[in-house]
Design a protein with these regions (language model features):
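Internal interaction segment
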Residues: 82, 86, 91-185
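Bacterial Sec-dependent N-terminal signal peptides
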Residues: 1-23
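Short small/polar-residue motifs
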Residues: 34-44, 71, 79-83, 99-103, ...
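Beta-strand elements of well-folded, non-transmembrane domains
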Residues: 59-63, 78-82, 142
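Beta-strand signatures of extracellular beta-sandwich domains
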Residues: 75-77, 137
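Generic cytosolic/nucleocytoplasmic N-terminal low-complexity/intrinsically disordered segments
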Residues: 1-2, 36, 57, 171
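Generic marker of residues within folded, mature protein domains
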Residues: 9, 47, 64-66, 76, ...
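An ectodomain-focused feature that recognizes extracytoplasmic/extracellular
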Residues: 20-74
Length: 185
């Protein structure tokens, strides 16, 4: 039993390190409690000679892990009225991590999930042209979704931080592939 627990702890630590290595997570600033706000970051890797960009989404729940299936998706509404659908990366695992915080005499457990979604070039183009994200909907599975209205004063900052996350992901991917680009000099 102790060995199984040790393996599980090691697996959880590895998953959280993987998520941390993927990029800095950007808070979705909305009216939700600070601990329950989703966080986003871009990741990029090369598959079959193609650079593939994904959006890593971290969600938090206090009762249990959020559950995802193949119908999971993220809908992003931009300030120009456009809405973009990001589908869950087929076959990608949902990474999970539990942590606790003490609040007075109570200990609260938080259940984090990390899920990857496909990113269309349109999302990057809108961020590059300074178009802010005003709303995010995470569809965990059919009939189970949550909307996040982005606080107006934070919209531009969030778009800027996400663009920076994308640029950092591109540079990391270049370095992993041995590209000694001068972009980060």
């Amino acid at each position: 039993m102790k060995k199984v627990f040790s393996v599980m702890v090691a697996l959880m630590m590895a998953l959280s390190m993987i998520a941390a290595e993927r990029g800095k997570l950007i808070h979705v600033d909305c009216s939700t409690s600070k601990n329950l706000k989703p966080q986003l970051a871009f990741c990029q890797e090369t598959k079959d000679g193609q650079d593939v960009t994904t959006l890593l989404v971290k969600t938090v729940n206090v009762n249990q892990y959020n559950e995802f299936n193949d119908a999971s998706r993220v809908l992003v509404r931009f300030a120009d009225g456009a809405a973009v659908r990001l589908n869950k990366v087929p076959g990608s695992a949902v990474e999970k991590k539990k942590h606790t915080e003490k609040k007075g005499n109570a200990t609260i457990s938080f259940y984090d999930t990390y899920t990857s979604y496909e990113v269309s070039p349109e999302v990057i183009e809108k961020l590059e042209t300074g178009i802010a994200i005003i709303k995010v909907r995470i569809v965990f599975k059919e009939n189970d979704s949550k909307d996040y209205d982005i606080v107006e004063g934070y919209q531009a900052k969030m778009a800027e931080d996400l663009l920076k996350s994308y640029q950092e992901a591109v540079l990391k991917n270049r370095k992993v592939n041995g590209d000694t680009a001068d972009d980060d000099f």
